[in-house]
From Swiss-Prot:
Enzyme nomenclature, EC number: 3.6.4.-
Native source organism of the sequence: Meyerozyma guilliermondii (strain ATCC 6260 / CBS 566 / DSM 6381 / JCM 1539 / NBRC 10279 / NRRL Y-324)
Keyword field contains Ribonucleoprotein: no
Key words of the record: ATP-binding, Helicase, Hydrolase, Nucleotide-binding, Nucleus, Ribosome biogenesis, RNA-binding, rRNA processing
Pfam families to which the protein is assigned, alphabetical: DEAD, Helicase_C
Name of this protein: ATP-dependent rRNA helicase RRP3
Region ranges (Disordered): 30-59, 451-475
Length: 475
């Protein structure tokens, strides 16, 4: 029988570990770690300038309603149906120039409306000259690729637009058949579309008119650089190119020079920053009580929409099981799940069937999750850029939000680096009273043991299934 979480009340009284002694332990441990291990690389330097060939425009309102753009009626009807009323800054800055046929480099965070900023001009152009393989949109993750396809499908619903999503983890033959149906819009991860360009007979992008690189900084962070180089060599040089990124780094500037021609740069935000309406804090915890503090926080924010970020797939899976055993409605999201499992988790969280999403950094950027109340950093991220993207999942579209980071004695170096980039110290939230925490710890310890057992059983069953399948094939 699943244990019901005890309702824990927040208090400023005695904590599990005295804050001063814990801080001293943290400092000692950090000095020890500094001698023993190399420091994690700093995030790539952000550059404030672009090449002389680019034209900078400010993010002031270029138009006030979509009806001012003289779009085709079918596209306008879809825009109205989707309730796009007032353009976002990136849409206002980019769309007019894109409709003039100019290359665009857009600097904007996830959730700024940038998908529509490139989809609307492409669909307007496609209406005037419909042909297959018209546009290729490259995305760093499968989830983002599916969401971009959904936006194209919704905006192109009255135009007869055919789109396809080409990502890893799906059957190559099925995808080849989809490509042979000659879709107008291809949304893909770089590695998989390159596989098809090299191996799928009859498929080429010689007639491509538009290339979009979305979340380009992340494409490069995830080592898609070589695949991007190959793609740029096999597509027409005479094309329109849009590059969207959260930040302007040296790598992005280099990619811009290699792929764009006299682009217009629209910068909504190109610095490390968090939203003004985001309340950020941290809790000093001892490593052995980390799960207990997590459950305490899930109790505190009962009924809220919560994303918990962990560092590894194993932590994500185990923390999800722990939360479920203790009666919480939680779903996992990480790279070792199948595509259908990942989409299933996302849909449950977005629809409210589960109010807790426990995830690796795959959920930090690019996912369309409309309303998140709280972000909990169960594991401190390894760089400040990842921290800013994680906490940026809440306090969006003018709403307020809360983020809490659990900091152990092993996290000080990373934590101090994050504070340095933020430019201020995160306030410390008080721990619950010692007796309440210890009582909760007993339940959490028991549930943790059960979660570990279930994880082990699952892996053993999966290994046995693989062995049985192999034996059947050999017979």
């Amino acid at each position: 029988m699943a244990l019901k979480p005890e309702k824990v009340k927040s208090s400023k009284s005695a904590s599990t570990v005295d804050a001063k002694s814990l801080a001293e332990k943290i400092k000692k441990n950090a000095l020890k770690q500094k001698k023993q291990a190399p420091v994690t690389e700093k995030p790539e330097e952000i550059v404030e300038t672009t090449s002389e060939a680019s034209q900078d425009v400010n993010s002031e309102q270029q138009f006030h309603t979509f009806s001012e753009l003289n779009l085709v009626p079918e596209l306008m009807e879809a825009i109205e149906k989707l309730k796009y009323t007032k353009p976002t800054p990136i849409q206002s800055g980019a769309i007019p120039h894109a409709l003039e046929g100019k290359d665009i480099i857009g600097l904007a965070q996830t959730g700024s409306g940038k998908t529509a900023a490139f989809a609307i001009p492409i669909l307007q152009s496609l209406w005037e000259a419909q042909r297959p393989y018209y546009a290729l949109v490259l995305a760093p993750t499968r989830e983002l690729a599916y969401q971009i396809k959904e936006t194209f499908d919704a905006l192109g619903s009255g135009m007869g637009v055919r789109s396809v999503c080409i990502v890893g983890g799906m059957d190559m033959m099925d995808q080849a058949r989809d490509l042979m149906r000659k879709p107008h819009i291809l949304v893909a991860t770089p590695g998989r579309i390159m596989d098809h360009l090299e191996n799928t007979k009859g498929f080429s992008l010689k007639s491509l008119q538009y290339l979009v690189m979305d979340e380009a900084d992340r494409l490069l962070d995830m080592d898609f650089g070589p695949a991007l180089d190959k793609i740029l060599k096999v597509i027409p040089t005479k094309r329109t190119t849009y590059l969207f990124s959260a930040t302007m780094t040296n790598k992005i500037a280099k990619l811009q020079r290699a792929s764009l021609h006299e682009p217009v740069k629209v910068a909504v935000s190109n610095k490390y920053q968090t939203a003004d309406n985001l309340v950020q804090s941290m809790m000093l915890v001892s490593d052995g009580y980390k799960n207990t503090f997590l459950i305490h926080l899930l109790n505190e924010f009962m009924g809220k929409s919560i994303i918990v970020f962990t560092r590894t797939c194993a932590h994500t899976q185990r923390s999800t099981l722990l939360a479920r055993i203790l009666g919480f409605s939680a779903v996992p999201l990480h790279g070792q799940l199948t595509q259908s499992q990942r989409l299933g988790s996302l849909n449950k969280f977005k629809s409210g069937k589960a109010n807790i999403l426990i995830a690796t950094d795959v959920a930090a950027r690019g996912l369309d999750i409309p309303s998140v109340d709280v972000v909990i950093n169960y594991d401190i991220p390894t760089d400040s850029k990842a921290y800013i993207h994680r906490v940026g999942r809440t306090a969006r579209a003018g709403k307020s939000g809360k983020s809490i980071s659990l900091v152990t004695q092993y996290d000080l170096e990373m934590y101090l680096r994050i504070e340095s980039v933020l430019g201020f110290k995160l306030p410390k939230d008080p721990s619950p009273p010692r007796d309440v925490l210890n009582a909760l710890h007993v339940h959490v310890d028991r549930a943790s043991a059960e979660a570990i057992k279930q994880t082990k059983d699952f892996h053993e069953k999966r290994t046995k299934k693989k062995r049985d399948d192999r034996d059947r094939e050999e017979r």
